[in-house]
Amino acid sequence: MSDPTYRVVPFAADFDLESFDCGEAAYNDWLTLHAGASVKAGVCAVYLLVERSEDSDRVVGYFAINPTQVVREQAPASLSRGWPLSVPAWKLGKLAVHVDLRADKLAQWGSQLLREAIETVIRVADAGGGKVIVVDADNSGLLDFYARNGFKATGLDGDLSLYMKVSTARKAFHP
């Protein structure tokens, strides 16, 4: 029996989404109940991390991105200096990894999937613009994960939003 291989593919409803379990019911439900409709409506793009073994494909992670904007007055000065009233941005709306992969601390699947999401944003920003990648951590426990992966907190009290300039991401991933 060979080791499984992994690939990231655009959302397709023909994968078995019901077996996905990241340990967070809201994220599991969003994938199975809302992702397809969101993609079809053009609200966001969803990408699946698929594990291929000898006999099947299994969804073991996903992320969703969508265009947004950041308003200068709502952004930290260190980010928004020199901006017009608002700038185009990309939001990482969802990022989830199956509980089976989260146990593999060596592979760091969460960070790998985040990197894939950032690479995807770089590609779409190169084609259509965007200055910033924004993520809203669902809880304070996720702030450290995103900070370890290059995102900066806004510094505003109680704000769980983090950001990374697209130019910073481009330099980090395409030196």
Residue ranges: model-predicted function:
Residues 1-106, 111-175:
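Non-catalytic substrate-recognition and accessory regions of acyl/acetyltransferase enzymes
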